[in-house]
Structure formats: structure tokens, C-alpha cells
From Swiss-Prot:
Protein origin, superkingdom: Bacteria
Principal location: membrane
Record-linked InterPro entries: K+_transporter (IPR003855), K_trans_C (IPR053952), K_trans_N (IPR053951), Kup (IPR023051)
Any GO molecular function: potassium ion transmembrane transporter activity
Organism this protein belongs to: Lactobacillus delbrueckii subsp. bulgaricus (strain ATCC 11842 / DSM 20081 / BCRC 10696 / JCM 1002 / NBRC 13953 / NCIMB 11778 / NCTC 12712 / WDCM 00102 / Lb 14)
The name this protein goes by in its record: Probable potassium transport system protein Kup
Gene: kup
Length: 667
């Protein structure tokens, strides 16, 4: 834990939870009929609910318990799943659903935080009688412009602007605390909210018109708690533990201050439109506060966008999602940019802004997906605790207590289902469906694909060598290159050899099997060779840094020259060439894709699952782009994907019909 580390943590981790004061109290007041209908008991109970929700779900569950469950220093729901996935097969379900819910939140957080911040400008005078932002349409235009700029700059990375995140968020939290203290004044009776009795009492009190549905608004105070866990790998456990007390105190003071201001201004009009956060700020600094709030909202949105990129990259590694083009704007592997994800996030976020139009409507959708992710994380945490400590009463009480709390919040969020909650759920289900199809489609294919099993490449080297010298077959290419994942330097998918040997035998001077391995270093450019004691069967393991372009065509030509030079393989002199002395022949690259065979005997559901998985593969990253083969001679071959038990019904032979005795023959 260092001062610099604490500052970085404040800038990266707390953006989402740090912007919650912008809309939590506003949502509670609107749900109870407006500012002129609330009383002291409601406000004290509300703040008590907020403080104890943040204490239990953020401080206890996340900071005290979840931060212990790191995977080589990395946190988050997928890192947690990776720790326990061998324990039980069903654990993949909470991991998939929770991950999908967090990705869904990545579209909602930028929409609601930026819109809420900009709404503070509405009705604000710039000079005498000049009100440039007088309606919601203007708010939407400004919000969309900010979001467009935010998503457009992602390709450049956040290394430079990211240095400002810490100082800006430090000022933001200090501002929250100071504004809270100013509005508390001498009204220290508000500290009664520290007593959880008032939180429980509020849920059953008649002056709480929203009933248990109030929890849907209260939960907004702890959205962003999952970031403390998922970002632990970026900023370090010690820096999160050290910075959280400061953040918690500043948030608490601001909620106290809003509560006092509300009770001192219950006679105001515009009952449901008042935002106590902005209203309690003195007019002479309100514009500055809106600018600061907008910056905090942008930083919160940036954190969610960056987190979404990281989550998708982890999903790809766990085979929850198909392969995508991942770029690295800086020399640090943690700084990634996924164009497809950025485009989908940007389009969805702006569509949500246009659909809901106001932050009040967005708040109805916001929160539901996070309650889902928190519940699934609780389940996975319990399994991790059992794995580490065994079954005991403490672990059982943990899962019962926190699952009950999360289910209560989920139920209250579902009360807003028809008012916008369905949007959050639909986005979550859509993402989860893609994950389910890809993950279980792969499972079905691997478990039932006898024809796609791995075989030993060294057992086929003699056959490949003989084919290379067999004049009965025309030369298909001088160098036939298969992009194949060769495991342990010798195991290769049978479908690759099927393509060479069974599908019109392909004669070549040299057969190349290339595996691309991405390393944790940014600029690695190395290769290893295994020829299996031959001159024309070569397994190449490429080791490329995560910032290196995967230009297999360029690298392979250099490798061929190196191997010819040291006599590892034979030269390939060319009789007809524009380059005198050329000793390397042509290259043909082959990508093998699966196509479901009609002989597949799987159940209808499993067959549909594999077909859907193949369709997703076709829609994902083009192999030519992935391997840098856009200008190479490349073919994509389809091989039959035969799944399930093969049952070939025998056909019975009969004697031919004797037409000599028919009337047709007599004519």
C-alpha cells in the first residue's frame, strides 16, 4: 500500500459507487410521492438502509471476504469461478449468469450516471435570465455527445487521461464529504441513522409508501461494489482496503447532508423532480459541481467500459465467448481495447438514453442486473469458502444471510420490471444466451466428436513424407500451412490430417503446422521448431507478445529462410521467378472449419446447440484477420463434424428385375 497506489485505487475502483449520491435519494423521494410528503422517520430510515446496505454488501461481503478470494492476484466473478470450477460442474451456471449481468450493467451505468450529471444543468441560469438547458431534449443531446466522445476515444487507450482519474476522484469524494458536513450543520440528530433499528423499522412502517420496493432504490447506493473485487488485480488488495474507509466516510457524510437538507425543505414545489444532491449545493458553486459530477460520471463510465473489455477477454479465455479481435493501446497487457465490444456497448448505451429519456426512468432498469451478479457471486464465494475451510456453521450462515439480503434486493428490483427492469433483464439474458451456446456447444462437440479427436502427429510423419514424394499426385503447393493448435508439440486434431490425406490427398514439398501462442510480454517475437526427424513435416510454435501483430505470413517466410539456411529443411529453388536465386516456394494457408454432418445422431437440443455454436463462430472474427493473412493465398475448408454414436443401417441387396417377361419387352 502506497500513497500513489491509494490515489490510483480511488481513481479506478470507486467511480460507480462514488456517483451513487447523484440519484439514490432522488429515487427514494420520487418513489414516496415527492419531497413535500416525506417526514423525519422516512429520511432517517432511508439513510440507515443506505449505510447498512453499503456496510454489509460492500464492506463485509466484498472488502472483508471477497478480496481474500483472488486468483494469482486477480479478482472478479470469472477469476473466482476459475478457482473452484473443478469442484462441481454446475458452478458454471452462476458464473455465466453473473458475468452476463455485469456486462449488462456496463451499458446501463454510463447511461444513468452521465444523464443524471447533465440533468443538473436543466434550469440553471448562465447570466441574467439565460437558461441554455431548459428542457430534457437538450440534456439528451449533451449526454449523447459526451457518450459518443467517450466511446470514440477508447481505441487510443486511457494511459494519458487515466493519470487524471485519481486526482479528480479525490477532489470529488472530498467535495461530497464537505457538502455533506455543510448541510448537516448542527443537526447531529441525523446520526440516529447509524442505528440499524431505523432501517428495519422503515420497511414495515406506514409512512414508507413504497414498502419493500424501496429497496430497489436503496440498492443503487451499492452499485459498483463488484468493481472493488474485479479491479483488485489492477490496483492491489492493500490499496483497496486502505482507500475504502475514506470513500465510505465521504459517501456517508453526503447522504447525511442530503437527508438534513430534505427535511429542511419539505415545503418545496416540483415534488417529484427535485434532486437533493444538486439542490443542497450553494448556487454560486453549482455550475462547478455539475462539471465535477460530469467528470466523475465519465470516469465511472470509463471504469465500466474498461471492466467490460477485461471481462470479455476473460470470457474468451474460459471459452464462454467466441474469439474477438483484442488490441493493446499501451505496453501494459491490462490495457485492452476490443472494437466489437466497444461498438456494441456504445450503440446499446446511446439507445438506452434515447429509449428512457430521463434518469428517473433509467433508475427503474438500473440495479436489477447487479443484484443478479451479487447473488451469483455470493454462491461462488460460499463454494470457495467450503473449498478452503470445509463445511462449517460460519460458512453456512454466510451464504444464508447474504443470499437472503441479495434475494430481497432482487425482489424489490423486480417490482420495477414493467417500468424498465425488463430491459436490464433482456440484455442479461441475451448475453447469457450467447455464453451458454458457445460454452455448451463446445462441450457437446468435444464430448461427442469422435471424428474430431486429437491424434499424434508423429504417427503420420511417414505417410506425409511419402505423399510429399509421390509423383502420382499433382503438387498442391510448395508449402502447405495449417493454422492448427498443436498440443504438447505432438497432438493435433484429426480433422487437419483428414483434410490433407482423405480429402483429395494434398501433395506439398513441406507441411507446416503453426500454433500461435500469445505471451504476457508486449513485444515477444520467438518461435520453436519440431521436425519429427523429417525434412518436410514441421511443427512451428510461434510466441508473440500481446502487442505484436499476428502476421503469420510474414513471420513464416523468415522462418523458412532460417530453416533452409541451417539445413533443417531442403531448399525450394524456383525455375520461374522474378527474383533471381529465389529458394522458397509458394505458400497456401488452410483454415479448417466444422460443418455438422447429416450423420450426426445427437438429440435435437444438442444438435441445435452445436449448430448455433457454429453460426456464432462464423459471425466472430475472420480467421484471415486474426492470423494476419488478408493478402495471403488462403482457403477455408469445411470438414464434417460427426457427433454421437454412428449407426449405419445396412441396405439389403436384391436381384435385378427381369424385364424380359414384361409387356414392355414384348412391344
Amino acid at each position: 500500500m502506497t500513497a500513489a497506489g491509494l490515489l490510483i485505487a480511488i481513481g479506478i475502483v470507486y467511480g460507480d459507487i462514488g456517483t451513487s449520491p447523484l440519484y439514490v435519494m432522488k429515487s427514494v423521494i420520487a418513489g414516496n410521492g415527492g419531497i413535500n410528503t416525506v417526514g423525519r422517520d422516512l429520511i432517517i430510515g432511508t439513510i440507515s438502509l443506505i449505510l447498512w446496505t453499503v456496510t454489509l454488501l460492500t464492506t463485509v461481503q466484498t472488502v472483508i471476504i471477497a478480496l481474500r478470494a483472488t486468483n494469482h492476484g486477480e479478482g472478479g466473478i470469472f477469476a473466482l469461478y476459475a478457482l473452484i470450477r473443478k469442484k462441481a460442474a454446475w458452478l458454471v451456471w452462476p458464473a455465466l449468469i453473473g458475468g452476463a449481468a455485469i456486462l449488462a450493467d456496463g451499458t446501463l451505468t454510463p447511461a444513468v450516471t452521465v444523464t443524471t450529471a447533465i440533468e443538473g444543468l436543466k434550469g440553471l441560469e448562465f447570466g441574467k435570465g439565460n437558461v441554455p438547458v431548459s428542457n430534457q431534449t437538450t440534456v439528451l443531446v449533451i449526454t449523447i455527445v459526451i457518450l459518443l466522445v467517450l466511446f470514440s476515444i477508447q481505441r487510443m487507450g486511457t494511459r494519458i487521461i487515466g493519470k487524471a482519474f485519481g486526482p479528480i476522484m479525490l477532489v470529488w469524494f472530498a467535495f461530497l464529504g464537505v457538502m455533506g458536513l455543510i448541510n448537516i450543520g448542527g443537526n447531529w440528530w441525523i446520526l440516529q441513522a447509524l442505528n440499524p433499528y431505523y432501517a428495519i423499522k422503515l420497511l414495515f412502517s406506514p409512512y414508507n409508501k413504497a414498502g419493500f420496493a424501496i429497496l430497489g432504490s436503496i440498492f443503487l447506493a451499492t452499485t459498483g461494489a463488484e468493481a472493488l473485487y474485479s479491479d483488485v488485480g489492477h490496483v492491489g488488495k492493500g490499496n483497496i482496503i486502505g482507500s475504502w474507509p475514506f470513500v465510505f466516510v465521504c459517501l456517508s457524510l453526503n447522504y447525511f447532508g442530503q437527508g438534513v437538507w430534505i427535511l429542511n425543505n419539505t415545503n418545496m414545489h416540483s415534488a417529484t423532480e427535485i434532486n437533493p444532491f444538486y439542490a443542497m449545493i450553494p448556487e454560486n458553486i453549482r455550475l462547478a459541481s455539475i462539471v465535477l459530477a460530469t467528470l466523475a460520471a465519465i470516469i465511472a463510465s470509463q471504469a465500466l467500459i474498461t471492466g467490460s473489455f477485461t471481462l470479455v477477454a476473460e470470457s474468451i479465455n474460459l471459452k464462454f465467448l467466441p474469439r474477438m479481435n483484442i488490441l493493446y493501446p499501451s505496453d501494459e497487457r491490462g490495457q485492452i481495447y476490443i472494437p466489437a465490444v466497444n461498438k456494441m456497448l456504445g450503440i446499446t448505451t446511446i439507445a438506452l438514453v434515447l429509449f428512457f429519456r430521463t434518469s428517473a426512468h433509467m433508475e427503474a432498469a438500473y440495479g436489477l442486473s447487479i443484484t443478479i451478479s451479487m447473488l451469483t457471486t455470493t454462491i461462488l464465494l460460499y463454494e470457495w469458502l467450503v473449498l478452503k475451510q470445509g463445511h462449517n456453521l460460519a460458512n453456512l450462515l454466510f451464504v444464508i444471510f447474504f443470499s437472503t439480503i441479495n434475494i430481497l434486493f432482487m425482489g424489490s428490483s423486480l417490482s420495477k420490471f414493467t417500468h424498465g427492469g425488463y430491459v436490464s433483464l433482456l440484455i442479461t439474458l441475451l448475453i447469457a444466451s450467447v455464453m451458454v451456446v458457445w460454452y455448451f456447444g463446445n462441450k457437446v462437440r468435444d464430448q461427442n466428436g469422435a471424428g474430431n479427436a486429437y491424434v499424434r502427429l508423429d504417427e503420420y510423419t511417414d505417410m506425409l513424407t511419402n505423399l510429399s514424394h509421390d509423383d502420382n499426385y499433382p503438387t498442391y503447393s510448395d508449402n502447405l500451412v495449417y493454422m492448427a493448435n498443436v498440443k504438447y508439440n505432438k497432438f493435433i486434431k484429426r480433422e487437419i490430417l483428414y483434410s490433407i490425406l482423405d480429402k483429395r490427398p494434398k501433395r506439398a514439398r513441406a507441411y507446416w503446422f503453426v500454433t500461435v501462442n500469445v505471451t504476457n510480454e508486449p513485444f515477444t517475437a520467438e518461435y520453436a521448431v519440431n521436425t519429427f526427424g523429417t525434412k518436410n513435416v514441421i511443427n512451428i510454435q510461434l510466441y508473440l507478445g500481446f502487442k505484436k501483430q499476428t502476421s503469420v505470413n510474414v513471420y513464416l517466410r523468415q522462418i523458412v529462410h532460417d530453416l533452409i539456411k541451417d539445413n533443417t529443411i531442403e531448399a525450394q529453388p524456383q525455375e520461374y521467378t522474378t527474383t533471381p536465386g529465389r529458394d522458397v516456394g509458394d505458400f497456401k494457408f488452410v483454415i479448417v472449419n466444422d460443418v455438422i454432418s447429416p450423420s450426426t445422431t445427437l438429440s435435437s437440443y444438442k444438435k441445435w446447440l452445436v449448430k448455433a455454436r457454429v453460426q456464432l463462430q462464423n459471425l466472430s472474427l475472420n480467421p484471415a484477420q486474426w492470423f494476419g493473412l488478408e493478402f495471403a493465398d488462403m482457403v477455408i475448408e469445411r470438414v464434417p463434424l460427426i457427433l454421437g454414436k454412428q449407426e449405419h443401417e445396412r441396405i439389403k441387396r436384391v436381384a435385378p428385375v427381369d424385364y424380359s417377361k414384361t409387356s414392355l419387352n414384348k412391344k
